[in-house]
């Protein structure tokens, strides 16, 4: 197989190796696709609409991240990404009659948020960007899909109105960068940073914490 088109790209972007970054991308893709498909199904979209929303919700953040980094979107060269989206859609359709999945979706979305934040931040560091850019791209990777999902499903964007999704991703990305600056390994940075994302969101939901809103 000719892999010359991958020259200069991080190792995890090759089609074959299963590195930590690759696994993180697959996990976040599957989770975001599953949540997106369920949200679309609950809005009464047809099968095509469900598949479209699942795809947009799962790959838009990583695609935007890679564009900023001058890389090809990972789903173009890695068939496992598309496979994970298809699997998420199929699971949603098979279990479409299952109700009361709100808490389950919230847990999965929180997990996906943590994984995507770590994936975006770590990849940015591999591309030798500044620490500020790494944090920003980590947040972009995590929140873009959910924002587009809500807009396309004609829902009030959770990112802009409720909870602390953006803040949670920001805190996790900052944690990753801080640990990285102290020469901790990528695995430790990702585990601790991801835990911060999850903890921040869980605490904010439990105590109904959110950023202050503008009032006239």
Residue ranges and their predicted role:
Residues 48-56, 78-82, 102-113, 137, ...:
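Cytoplasmic-side transmembrane-helix entry/capping segments in multi-pass membrane proteins
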Residues 18-20, 67-76, 121-133, 178-189:
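Helix-coil boundary and interhelical linker segments in multi-pass alpha-helical membrane proteins
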Residues 33-43, 66, 89-103, 147-157, ...:
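C-terminal ends of transmembrane helices
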Residues 87-124:
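Ordered, amphipathic secondary-structure segments that act as subunit-interaction surfaces
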Residues 140, 190-203:
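Small-residue-rich transmembrane alpha-helices that serve as helix-helix interface/gating elements
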Residues 52-56, 63-69, 136, 140, ...:
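Short, structured motif recognition centered on aromatic/hydrophobic residues
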């Amino acid at each position: 197989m000719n892999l010359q088109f991958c020259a200069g790209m991080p190792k995890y972007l090759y089609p074959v190796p299963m590195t930590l970054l690759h696994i993180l991308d697959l996990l976040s893709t599957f989770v975001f696709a599953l949540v997106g498909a369920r949200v679309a199904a609950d809005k009464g979209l047809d099968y095509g609409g469900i598949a479209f929303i699942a795809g947009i919700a799962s790959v838009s953040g990583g695609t935007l991240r890679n564009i900023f980094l001058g890389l090809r979107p990972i789903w173009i060269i890695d068939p496992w990404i598309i496979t994970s989206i298809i699997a998420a859609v199929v699971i949603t359709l098979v279990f479409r009659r299952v109700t009361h999945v709100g808490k389950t979706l919230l847990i999965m979305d929180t997990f996906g948020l943590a994984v995507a934040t770590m994936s975006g931040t770590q990849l940015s560091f591999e591309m030798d960007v500044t620490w500020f850019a790494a944090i920003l791209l980590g947040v972009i990777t995590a929140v873009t899909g959910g924002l587009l999902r809500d807009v396309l499903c004609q829902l009030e964007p959770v990112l802009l109105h409720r909870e602390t999704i953006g803040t949670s991703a920001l805190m996790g990305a900052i944690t990753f960068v801080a640990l990285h600056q102290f020469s901790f390994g990528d695995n430790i940075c990702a585990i601790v940073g991801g835990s911060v994302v999850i903890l921040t969101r869980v605490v904010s939901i439990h105590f109904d914490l959110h950023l202050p809103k503008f009032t006239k």
